């Protein structure tokens, strides 16, 4: 059995760790509400953009935007993968990466090449480690990300799609369901799925200034940016929720460990006292 001093050192070490996990749990709990508010604030814009896209897609025009055209053969697939910058969030990132690799494998089996754009330090490190072709990356967005921080990496994938270098683009992120549940999501970004741009049947007739191609190009790009931005906000909320749950579990485990070590310490102390008494009694009997 370990000595009393060694056990007390272990107890002190676990207590210090518990202070850290409790602090991280409280910080994450305070950040979840703000993250949820940002999600709710951005949703009306995304919904309005979705409705406009639906109207424009069904409008009477000779111009068909490439974002709406499904390609017959898919030779290269692009992924925009969103992760956290920091760890200590349980299996949030690893579960997402594991499921994504499962989604990628069928494409690779057909001979399709894979390109990846990463948002977040964890995704960047993971895909560099497994040597996937990364064509863009952005990290350290903070707890209040701005759409301007994302435009560069989004443009990389949009340009690749327009130029025919990529035939399909997916958005991969953790969707925030509630504090206890975050769901790995894989949304087709380009070309826009039919359900995304279809509305109730109407013969929409628009006047375009300067022309349909210019207007659609601008609106479609803003819509894609809004989808990625919304996904980033969802992922931030998921990160804080996962970290809060993970740190609470760590704090609970620390409490159990401290209780166990305290019991071991008490037994060791009792054994030491009993031994001392026995030695004293034995010494007295010898005299």
Curated annotation (Swiss-Prot):
Matching Pfam families: ATP-synt (PF00231)
Keywords attached to this Swiss-Prot or TrEMBL record, sorted alphabetically, are: ATP synthesis, Cell inner membrane, Cell membrane, CF(1), Hydrogen ion transport, Ion transport, Membrane, Transport
**Under the GO molecular function aspect, what terms does this record hold?**
ATP binding; proton-transporting ATP synthase activity, rotational mechanism
Membrane-protein topology: Peripheral membrane protein
List this protein's GO terms for biological process. proton motive force-driven plasma membrane ATP synthesis
Q: Tell me the compartments it is located in.
A: Cell inner membrane
Q: What is its main location?
A: membrane
Q: Which GO terms describe its cellular component?
A: plasma membrane; proton-transporting ATP synthase complex
Would you say which domain of life the source belongs to? Answer: Bacteria
Q: Quaternary structure?
A: F-type ATPases have 2 components, CF(1) - the catalytic core - and CF(0) - the membrane proton channel. CF(1) has five subunits: alpha(3), beta(3), gamma(1), delta(1), epsilon(1). CF(0) has three main subunits: a, b and c.
Which family does the UniProt entry place this protein in? Belongs to the ATPase gamma chain family.
Role, per record:
Produces ATP from ADP in the presence of a proton gradient across the membrane. The gamma chain is believed to be important in regulating ATPase activity and the flow of protons through the CF(0) complex.
Q: Per its record, how is this protein called by name?
A: ATP synthase gamma chain
